[in-house]
Structure formats: structure tokens, C-alpha cells
Amino acid sequence: NILAAGTDTTAAASVWAMTALVKNPRVMKKVQEEVRNVGGTKDFLDEDDIIKLPYLKAMIKETLRLYLPSQLLVPRESNEECIVDGYRVPAKTIVYVNAWVIQRDPEVWKNPEEFCPERFLDSAIDFRGQDFELIPFGAGRRICPGIPMAAVTLELVLANLLHSFDWELPQGMVKEDIDVEVLPGITQHKKNHLCLCAKTRSHI
């Protein structure tokens, strides 16, 4: 079911984005300032607003780099024997691509464990299958067909959450208390729930 697959992964990505933002207050402040400067006193940001939010888009790319929807891409079967990076792969071998490792490769990414949306601001790298260092949705003929829906949904959800609310940790918690453990499964969900306090902006 393509709709179920799209909503499940988008929900997981939204939680990971908010997790990363709460753990990185500098990024939270910067992306909220951008969103609120564009949104002003609007009740709801739409697609016309989203195109004016480059830092939000960079933040989403960085979220998908570190916390991609699925660590392993859809498996392939080799049609014939081949050599991949010096390794012999016999015909009829099931091959998995570990996107998690690719997207944290220190030979490709500077400080790969750091959540830094700025790395995408002056970069043409995108997650639509043309740049193999960033493939959270796969690549080639079997790339995820729901990329456009996932991208727009993520952008709208996060833009409006950040525009309309201020976010705080529950009393007694600090950002170091938030873990990034993952539940086992096809979709990479956060193991422990993210609990935040949302405060409505009074002047909206």
C-alpha cells in the first residue's frame, strides 16, 4: 500500500527532525527564524511559502542523511556474476545497499555524525536519486515513487510546527536525555517516544 508506506516513513522522519532540532538548539532557532520571517502572521504556511525556505529544506536533507527512513534499501538480485569494489558477486545473489553507512561515510561527509544543515546550503546534492552519497529513497528505476509526496508533506508539517509553536523539553529534562535509539523494523522509528511541550505563539 503506497499511501501507508508514505505516511509511515514521513511520520518517522518528522519525529527524527524534531529530535534533531531539540538536541541542536542553534539549528532550531535558525530554522524557526526563517520560517517565521516568511510566514509572518499567517495561520498556515503553504507550498508557495515553502519555496522561500532554503534552510528548512537543508535541515530536512540533513535529517534524512542521519536518520533515513530505512537503513537498507530495497534488495536487488544480481543477473550475472560481477565484481563490486574488488569483491566477486555470483549471479543470483541478493544484494542490499546500506544507505546508513553511505550517508555517514567520513570520506564523503565532513564531520558525518554532526547535525549540520549548513552543509547543504551551497550544495547541489539532493535526495532524488542522482547523488549517490545521499540516497534515503534509493536510486535508479526502483527509487521510491513517493518522493514528491514525502518531500512536500515533510516540508509542510515541519514548517507549520515550527511556525506556530515554541518547543521545550518537559520539566527536569535536558537535551542530553534524548536518545536516538532505533526500533528494529523496515522503517526506522525512534525506539523511545519523543515527548515535548508545545506552546502556541501568542501573537499568531
Each model region followed by its residue ranges:
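Conserved cytochrome P450 catalytic core segment spanning the I/J/K helices
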Residues: 1-14, 42, 46-49, 53, ...
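Conserved cytochrome P450 K-helix E-x-x-R motif and the immediately C-terminal K′/meander segment
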Residues: 46-87, 106, 113
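Conserved beta-strand elements of beta-rich interaction domains across eukaryotes
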Residues: 9, 94, 101-103, 122, ...
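Conserved cytochrome P450 K-helix/beta-meander segment immediately N-terminal to the heme-binding cysteine loop
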Residues: 67, 97-125
